[in-house]
Swiss-Prot record:
GO molecular function: ATP binding; glutamine-tRNA ligase activity
Motif 'KMSKS' region, chain ranges: 268-272
Species this chain originates from: Pseudoalteromonas atlantica (strain T6c / ATCC BAA-1087)
Gene name of the record: glnS
E.C. code: 6.1.1.18
Binding-site list for ATP: 35-37, 41-47, 231, 261-262, 269-271
Protein name (Swiss-Prot/TrEMBL): Glutamine--tRNA ligase
Location of this chain's protein in the cell: Cytoplasm
Family under the similarity heading: Belongs to the class-I aminoacyl-tRNA synthetase family.
UniProt xrefs under SUPFAM superfamilies: Nucleotidylyl transferase, Ribosomal protein L25-like
Length: 558
């Protein structure tokens, strides 16, 4: 798969083009500002590709800034995981990674400035009272009894907040805007709250922490961000973004623009819901291959290039829509079809005994690593008297549409000989345990000499040489296309989202170096694309199914 090389066009890039042409900006400066309270997911990948992609295409800069204003939910492990994901996706941020906490002193000074201008006040109303005073979407709010406290008293009270003289929840600093505004975010929003929590960057220096809407815009301005790109749920908050910057003394005034967030079928992208899946052990962790996290997708075998290509294909708009899972898989399937070396693996084996093959005979047959790329070379596959094939590749009786092994008929073994099934052996339950065959020793790499047609081809492994492997077959985590819309999304979890098979793989796979940072993918012929899992060891191979050979989502939708 070749990544799309042409520069994408969208409404944000059109705005940037106009800003550059008009001379409003000489250099474009964007940022990616995740909160370090969880792992990044595929929705974040869209934002990463947008912000870093714009900086690359316009020879600008993109900052990585951690929005770390909520210390009791954040962790340095999340910080490190986020950095790793951005790098893995192929991007490099400008300068050092930044933190909103870098600006806590400046943010505090700006809060004092708002108080001195009569634009902020300390409110001692409790949480329920604040909620009631806000009003509703159809009724205006009411002023707090603390709204008209003098500037001098507010300065003194805010200093006491800073000094730890008030308890958590006892008071908060609010902006003084308009309690009758039709926009809820403008009804005297909170700017600071008391929180006695250890911070992963600032330690115990602070016991008051700024709110996101106050921090976000000022951090953008301090860093010289020209275009602050957010998802549509922050559209109304742009009014507060602009209000803060208009009322503090700051040189750079960035502009916020909103685009639609990613909604992907058969998964959830809400961080709260993802945390619930992890905490309640519906999945094995943040990097469970069923998770839509970048770590989970990477472990499943998705490549950075395929994710970047997916983000290019879905584009950037202002219209929310649900993206089909097939859109995510298509670039990956294209890439793996082009690049993944081939191998043979049998997931549900049944034994074949080739009765006319020498008892102790072994041949090393040449098998191409890729049918269309001879430069990838070939490998040796051992062939012997006893082999395994997939149980589903054999029937005692079948119609003409079945092109695999049938009793009394022939089939070709991939990269090997033509065999014919003669008889079977069954267990007490009537299940076929062994198929006895004969092979045509003159058909290696060529058709039968007498011109008879053998249409079917099946894969196999040598019973004596194959390596045991645990093979994990992943499916969608949910049974409905939009689980987030359900009252109880966990009730929609797919009980068959993971099936574990104990199969056999050709011995060449045991010689591959297992590198978690650079996961090796393979096409298991006729089965799908697979990769090593991090649980794999030299004594126990573990493979994850990354994606099937063909798109199966269309069938689910029918």
């Amino acid at each position: 798969m070749a990544e799309t090389e042409s520069r994408p066009t969208n409404f944000i890039r059109q705005i940037i083009d106009k800003d550059l042409q008009s001379g409003l900006h000489k250099q474009i400066h964007t940022r990616f500002p995740p909160e370090p309270n969880g792992y990044l997911h595929i929705g974040h990948a869209k934002s990463i590709c947008l912000n870093f992609g714009i900086a690359q295409d316009y020879q600008g800069q993109c900052n990585l800034r951690f929005d770390d204003t909520n210390p009791d939910k954040e962790d340095i492990d999340y910080v490190n995981a986020i950095k790793n994901d951005v790098i893995w996706l192929g991007f490099e941020w400008h300068g050092e990674a930044r933190y909103s906490s870098n600006y806590f002193d400046q943010l505090h000074a700006y809060a004092v400035e708002l108080i001195e201008k009569g634009l902020a006040y300390v409110d001692f109303s409790n949480q329920e009272q604040v909620r009631e005073m806000r009003g509703t979407l159809t009724t205006p709010g009411t002023n707090s009894p603390y709204r008209d406290t003098s500037i001098e008293e507010n300065i003194a009270q805010f200093a006491k907040m800073r000094n730890g003289e008030y308890k958590e929840g006892e008071c908060l600093l609010r902006a003084k805007i308009d309690m009758s505004s039709p926009f809820m975010c403008m009804r005297d929003p909170a700017l600071y709250r008391v929180k006695f929590a250890h911070h992963h960057q600032t330690g115990d220096k602070w016991c008051i922490y700024p709110m996101y809407d106050f921090t976000h815009c000022i951090s953008d301005a301090i860093e010289g961000i020209t275009h602050s790109l957010c998802t549509l749920e922050f559209q109304d908050n742009r009014r507060l973004y602009d209000w803060v910057l208009e009322n503090v003394t700051i040189d750079v005034v960035p502009r916020q623009y909103e685009f639609s967030r990613l909604n992907l079928e058969y998964t959830v992208l809400s961080k709260r819901k993802l945390i619930q899946l992890v905490d309640e052990e519906f999945v094995s962790g943040w990097d469970d291959p069923r998770m839509p996290t970048i770590a989970g997708l990477r472990r499943r075998g998705f490549t950075a290039a395929s994710i970047r290509e997916f983000c290019k294909r879905i584009g950037v708009t202002k219209m929310d829509n649900m993206v089909e899972m097939s859109m995510l898989e298509a670039p990956l399937r294209d890439e793996l079809n082009e690049n993944a070396p081939r191998a043979m693996a049998v997931l549900e084996p049944v034994k074949i005994v080739i009765e006319n093959y020498p008892q102790d005979g072994v041949e090393l047959l040449a098998a191409p690593n890729h049918p269309n790329r001879p430069e990838l070379g070939s490998r040796e596959v051992p062939f012997a008297r006893e082999i395994y094939i997939e149980a589903e590749d054999f029937r005692e009786e079948a119609n003409k549409k079945f092109k695999r092994l049938v009793l009394g008929k022939e089939v070709r073994l991939r990269n090997a000989y033509v065999i014919k099934a003669q008889r079977v052996e069954k267990d007490e339950q009537g299940n076929v345990t062994t198929i006895f065959c004969e092979y045509d020793g003159d058909t290696l790499g060529k058709d039968p000499a007498d011109g008879r047609k053998v249409k079917g081809v099946i894969h196999w492994v040598s019973a004596a040489h194959a390596v045991a492997a645990e093979i994990r077959l992943y499916d969608s985590l949910f049974t409905v296309p939009n689980p987030a819309a359900e009252d109880d999304f966990v009730a929609c979890i797919n009980p068959e989202s993971l099936t574990v098979k104990q199969g056999w793989v050709e011995p060449s796979l045991a010689k591959v170096d297992i590198d978690e940072a650079n996961i090796q993918a393979f096409q298991f012929e006729r089965t799908g694309y697979f990769c090593f899992d991090k649980d794999s060891t030299t004594s126990k191979l573990v493979f994850n199914r990354t994606v099937g050979l063909r798109d199966t989502w269309a069938k689910i939708g029918d």
